Amino acid sequence: MAVFEKVQEIIVEELGKETEEVTLETTFDDLDADSLDVFQVISEIEDAFDIQIETEEGLNTVGDLVAYVEEKSK
């Protein structure tokens, strides 16, 4: 499974959103995610990809998060 699809799946599951709502351009504000929601999503992504996400700064969109995961997974 590609990184985007897995990240999308986690966001849909954790935030109760529809798959179509989660695109690379979607922001966490667009998803009505508060800081606890973002923390939970990041925690699930860390577990799924076996990485540590050092900071949430600069991770404004789903695309930012996907790019970060791809870089850390190398």
From Swiss-Prot:
Keywords: Cytoplasm, Fatty acid biosynthesis, Fatty acid metabolism, Lipid biosynthesis, Lipid metabolism, Phosphopantetheine, Phosphoprotein
Gene3D superfamilies for the chain: ACP-like (1.10.1200.10)
Gene Ontology cellular component list: cytosol; membrane
Source species, domain of life: Bacteria
Pathway named in the protein's UniProt entry: Lipid metabolism; fatty acid biosynthesis
Name of this protein: Acyl carrier protein
Subcellular location: Cytoplasm
Family under the similarity heading: Belongs to the acyl carrier protein (ACP) family.
HAMAP family: Acyl_carrier
Chain ranges of the Carrier domain: 1-73
Pfam family, one: PP-binding
InterPro entries per record: ACP (IPR003231), ACP-like_sf (IPR036736), PP-bd_ACP (IPR009081)
One MF term in the entry's GO annotations: acyl carrier activity
Biological function: Carrier of the growing fatty acid chain in fatty acid biosynthesis.
Post-translational modification: 4'-phosphopantetheine is transferred from CoA to a specific serine of apo-ACP by AcpS. This modification is essential for activity because fatty acids are bound in thioester linkage to the sulfhydryl of the prosthetic group.
Major location category of this protein: cytoplasm
GO biological process: lipid A biosynthetic process
Modification O-(pantetheine 4'-phosphoryl)serine occurs at: S35
Organism, as annotated: Streptococcus pyogenes serotype M1
